[in-house]
Amino acid sequence: MQKIFIILVLFCILKFNVDVEGRIASQCDLSACKERCEKQNKNGKCVIETEMDLVYRLCKCY
């Protein structure tokens, strides 16, 4: 019984770790974002958007 409990705890820890690290679908490089938006005479900013269970860090020009 104790072995089953330990396996269950380890499984939950690994599952949580994958959920946290695996949810980010894209990264935003702030310097590249600002450079791209400067060409449009706008300010660049990295924003976080969610869709379903995924988190996107996108570059937006304002």
UniProtKB/Swiss-Prot annotation:
Residues 1-22 form the signal peptide. Transmembrane segments: none annotated. Keywords: Disulfide bond, Ion channel impairing toxin, Neurotoxin, Potassium channel impairing toxin, Secreted, Signal, Toxin. The record marks 62 as: Aromatic residue of the functional dyad. Expressed by the venom gland. Disulfide bonds join 28-46, 33-59, 37-61. The keyword Disulfide bond applies. The record marks 45 as: Basic residue of the functional dyad. GO terms for molecular function: potassium channel regulator activity; toxin activity. GO terms for cellular component: extracellular region. It is found in: Secreted. Its main location: secreted. May block potassium channels. Has the structural arrangement of an alpha-helix connected to antiparallel beta-sheets by disulfide bonds (CS-alpha/beta). Belongs to the short scorpion toxin superfamily. Potassium channel inhibitor family. Alpha-KTx 23 subfamily. This is U10-buthitoxin-Hj1a. It comes from Hottentotta judaicus.
